[in-house]
A protein has these predicted regions:
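Terminal targeting signals and extreme-terminal segments of soluble enzymes
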Residues: 1-111
């Protein structure tokens, strides 16, 4: 699978995604790819297409290639202007990547 196909699988709500070995270095899938996939899962839960304003990513453990990865997204708060979400990428029931994000609507400003 190429990058677009992996994102499309997450966007399409696949139960799990398998990252091919070509997207790995050693025993772990590339961190940037894991961040992108988890971000895409989180974006699906954001109201009104609010853009990301901040992200904090923790690579908890290596995401092994060729092993199914599932994504869980929890909406911590949906406020009037900002949504705060927590995303988890899991393999074999263990968290491999954790992401907290704030997605906020723009504000009018004269600055």
């Amino acid at each position: 699978m190429n990058f677009s196909q992996l994102l499309a699988a997450v966007r399409g709500g696949e139960a799990s995604v398998i990252v091919p070995a070509s997207w790995a270095q050693g025993r772990a899938s590339f961190g940037g790819l894991m961040a992108a996939l988890l971000f895409e899962a989180m974006r699906q839960k954001v109201v009104d297409g609010r853009p990301a304003r901040s992200l904090a990513i923790t690579f908890v453990g290596p995401a092994a290639p060729e092993v199914p990865i599932t994504f869980e997204v929890e909406v911590l708060r949906d406020g009037k202007a900002v949504s705060t979400l927590l995303g988890r990428a899991l393999q074999n029931g263990e968290v491999v990547t954790l992401m907290q994000g704030s997605f906020g609507a723009g504000r009018e400003s004269v600055v």
